[in-house]
Amino acid sequence: MRIAIYPGSFDPVTYAHLDIARRATRIFDRVIMAVFDRPQKRLLFSTAERLQLLQAVTADLVNVEATSYEMLTVEFARQVGACAIVRGLRAGSDFEAEFQMAQVNQTIDPNIEVVVLMAGRQFAHISSTAVREMASLGRDPVEFTPPVVVAALREKFAQRG
C-alpha cells in the first residue's frame, strides 16, 4: 500500500487543500492529511479544532484520513509508513520555501519522496490567510472553504467581538 502524508497548518482548511488531497488519492492508496501542532506559530484555531474541522470535511473522501502530529514531518511520515510527503503549490512564490523544506526532508530520510502538486487554476488564489482575513472583516468565505469551516470562522470571530 502506497501511503502519503499531506501535512499543513490547515488554519483553516480550504477547498484548495481538499483539491490537493483528492488529486493525491489518484497517486497514492491512502492520503493522511496531518495537522501540524506548532505551539510557536500564532494560529486562529487550536490543533484540536483544526483536526475536528479537517475530519469533518474529509469524512466523505475515499482513502483520505485526518490526524495531527507534533514531530518533524519526515519523522511522522516514517512513523506512519508513508513513502511520500505531498505538498501543494499555488504560485511560483511558494516554490523556494517548499524546495528548501524538501531538501531538508530528503537529507533526513532520502527514502521519503516529496511530491508537489500544482493547485488547480480555480484554487490557485485561495489561501488560509485570505480566508481568515475575509472572516475577520465579517465576510463569509463560502467560495473558498466548506460550510462547516465558515460556521467555525463565524463563531470564532464572534467570540473575539
Swiss-Prot record:
Domain of life: Bacteria
Job of this protein: Reversibly transfers an adenylyl group from ATP to 4'-phosphopantetheine, yielding dephospho-CoA (dPCoA) and pyrophosphate.
Annotated family: Belongs to the bacterial CoaD family.
Subcellular location, record wording: Cytoplasm
Catalytic activity: (R)-4'-phosphopantetheine + ATP + H(+) = 3'-dephospho-CoA + diphosphate
Cofactors (names): Mg(2+)
Quaternary structure annotation from Swiss-Prot or TrEMBL: Homohexamer.
Binding annotation for substrate: 9, 41, 73, 87
Site (Transition state stabilizer): 17
Disulfide bond entries: none
Record GO terms (molecular function): ATP binding; pantetheine-phosphate adenylyltransferase activity
GO biological process terms, semicolon-separated: coenzyme A biosynthetic process
Enzyme Commission numbers on file: 2.7.7.3
Pathway in which this enzyme or protein is active: Cofactor biosynthesis; coenzyme A biosynthesis; CoA from (R)-pantothenate: step 4/5
InterPro entries on file: Cyt_trans-like (IPR004821), PPAT (IPR001980), Rossmann-like_a/b/a_fold (IPR014729)
Binding site for ATP: 9-10, 17, 88-90, 98, 123-129
Protein name: Phosphopantetheine adenylyltransferase
Keywords: ATP-binding, Coenzyme A biosynthesis, Cytoplasm, Magnesium, Nucleotide-binding, Nucleotidyltransferase, Transferase
Cellular component GO terms held in the UniProt record: cytoplasm
